[in-house]
Amino acid sequence: IRDDGESRGLGDVYKRQQAYGRIASVVNKIKKDLDFLDFAKANLRNMPTIDFDATTIVIAGFPNVGKSTLLNQISGADPQIANYPFTTKGIQIGHVERHWKSIQIIDTPGLLDRPVLEMNDIELNAIVALEHLADAILFIFDASETCGFGLESQYNLLKQIEKIFDNIPVIYLFNKMDLIEDTSYVEQYVDELDNSIFISAIEGEGIDKINKVLDSVKKIERNEEEEY
């Protein structure tokens, strides 16, 4: 016959085993959630540093129009590059100090010419960047159309962006002007867009004009409801 002390000891052991069993059961049930949190933590460490106090310029346009080249030219240094969490794309951020003014320039994943509801996750990330970060948009046309998209398609993309984000000023850049001889086809689009700038990002032509425009961009004051 066991004495009371031994019985109580075995009872405590049994209760602890029951508790451990319940805890293990709960952990198993939420294991997928815990694994996802570990994954998210690892990815968020690679997120580029975004300065929400700086004037933010978001570069937009189809792939291969010269966005990365332009970012390098304006920032004057290698931009910060990191994978955007939960996507296979990367975003690049360049930082510029001009006349005691901090400017950050963000190169987003390429936007495609179709309704927002049809966009994939990568494209929606670019939309979020435009909506919540941009104080101005640098929209780049490939005047040579060597990017694989005609000027009409690029113009339609611009109109889509302007319609969705009608409170954000847009600066129109026509890139790769060094590759075309007859500019009459380009000028029919330029005539519809005030303050367009002809540039060659790879040659560095027109960068001074862009910098002057960026100096005039004012930060948009957003309330909490707009930001979240």
Placement of each model-derived feature along the sequence:
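N-terminal pre-Walker A segment at the start of P-loop NTPase domains
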Residues: 23-47
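Switch I (effector-binding) loop of TRAFAC-class P-loop GTPase G-domains
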Residues: 75-104, 112-125, 151
